[in-house]
Amino acid sequence: MVHLTGEEKGIVTGLWGKVNVDEVGGEALGRLLVVYPWTQRFFDSFGDLSSAAAVMGNAKVKAHGKKVLDSFSEGLKNLDNLKGTFAKLSELHCDKLHVDPENFRLLGNVLVCVLARNFGKEFTPQVQAAYQKVVVGVATALAHKYH
């Protein structure tokens, strides 16, 4: 569970209503794969990931990034039950995909950076602090099955 004040919940959901999930999802996942290239091993079926340009232009990266942010959107609707919301994804990533749970934290941090880049001055320190709490909560929920 993530502990957000009513004001923080309003900040998070207010900004999220302006997020273009298609674009931001692809950008966030793409940046994760570029900045942390060892994460590419989980995406062998995505084709050419040989350069930053190839990753950022890859249709499968963009599509999966959208899928990731669609799940994140569900989490935002259930901030008081992130563990339950992400239970099946946690199990999938742990038992079948064997994803290092640290990658969830990395992706959350990249997402915060992408949001800051996209929203500029609107992404105030208060917005960043609220989103940082959320991405930590989501990463913790996704890592739950690993414990």
Swiss-Prot record:
In terms of SUPFAM superfamilies, this protein maps to: Globin-like
| Residue numbers of S-nitrosocysteine PTMs | 94
- Give the modified residues of type N-acetylvaline: 2
What is any Pfam family matched here?
Globin
All copies of the Globin domain together span 3-147
| One CC-aspect GO term | blood microparticle
What does the entry list as the binding residues for heme b? 64, 93
Source superkingdom: Eukaryota
Q: In which tissues is it expressed?
A: Red blood cells.
* Residues carrying N6-acetyllysine: 60, 83, 145
Keywords in alphabetical order, please.
Answer: Acetylation, Heme, Iron, Metal-binding, Oxygen transport, Phosphoprotein, S-nitrosylation, Transport
Instruction: List residues modified as Phosphoserine.
Output: 45
Q: Which residues carry this modification: Phosphothreonine?
A: 13
Q: What terms describe the molecular function in GO for this protein?
A: haptoglobin binding; heme binding; hemoglobin alpha binding; metal ion binding; organic acid binding; oxygen binding; oxygen carrier activity; peroxidase activity
InterPro entries of this UniProt entry? Answer: Globin, Globin-like_sf, Globin/Proto, Hemoglobin_b, Hemoglobin_oxygen_transport
Q: Name one GO biological process term.
A: hydrogen peroxide catabolic process
According to its UniProt entry, the function of this protein is described as: Involved in oxygen transport from the lung to the various peripheral tissues.
Q: Which family does it belong to?
A: Belongs to the globin family.
Q: How does it assemble?
A: Heterotetramer of two alpha chains and two beta chains.
For this protein, the record's PANTHER family field holds: HEMOGLOBIN FAMILY MEMBER (PTHR11442), HEMOGLOBIN SUBUNIT BETA (PTHR11442:SF42)
This protein is called Hemoglobin subunit beta
Provide the taxonomic classification. Answer: Eukaryota, Metazoa, Chordata, Craniata, Vertebrata
